[in-house]
Amino acid sequence: KALLNPGEEVIILAPYFVEYKFYIDNHGGTVKEVSTREDFSLDLEAIAKAIGPNTRTIIINTPNNPTGKVYSKKELEQLGDLLGQKEKELNRALYVISDEPYAKISYDGIKVPSIFKYIKRSILVTSHSKDLALPGERIGYAAVSPQMEDAGHVMEGLVFCNRTLGFVNAPALAQRLVTPLQRETVDIAAYQEKRDILYENLTRMGYKMVKPQGAFYLFPQS
């Protein structure tokens, strides 16, 4: 609601977290699905074709649920360049919402790039239910890129929208609890061990899948 006028389009990249469609519909937006490539990397050509005069926002999720894909610096940089071009063509602001509850859960030395370095109109949304292993505890934060010209206006909208959620707002105690834990995360060694065991055994059995780079999901071909 902080970004959309009723009926404006939100691009989501398939495969995606299934609840995105309900969030968008609940806030008056129109869903536009764009498939990723076979390895689940961004299909920039398909994204470019999907962006039109009614597009307002793209949602990305990295590391991805359900694929475990981590978008690279190059992909994010190219996406930022594409959006800059499209903003000039369409004469309208285009925003990226980066959903990153798994940002601290990545494997094999892979680091999740900061969206703020590559996309000017970006909003980072995260939840500590994953990186602090607090399943179902919806405590997190939203952050707006300092490069965004209308950052103050967007933040005001986000704050107001959060207030309208009422009883689901984080209590003061939870806010105090997570503040000193911003640089902490669960020990991901157990997650990586489980990923390796499942990946190695399932591929040995003949299943085909892209090896997850983060999160805790496997997405085999059916």
Question: Where do the model's predicted regions map?
Answer:
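Conserved core segment of the aminotransferase class I/II
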Residues: 120-192, 196-205
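Conserved PLP-binding catalytic core of the aspartate aminotransferase-like
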Residues: 38, 191-192, 196-199, 204-222
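Short beta-strand segments
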Residues: 59-61, 95-100, 126, 211, ...
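Short beta->alpha connector loops at strand-helix junctions that form conserved
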Residues: 14, 29-38
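Phosphate-binding glycine-rich loop
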Residues: 1-9, 23
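Active-site pre-lysine segment of PLP-dependent enzymes
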Residues: 25, 32, 41-54, 66, ...
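Conserved coil-to-alpha-helix start sites within the AMP-binding
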Residues: 16-20
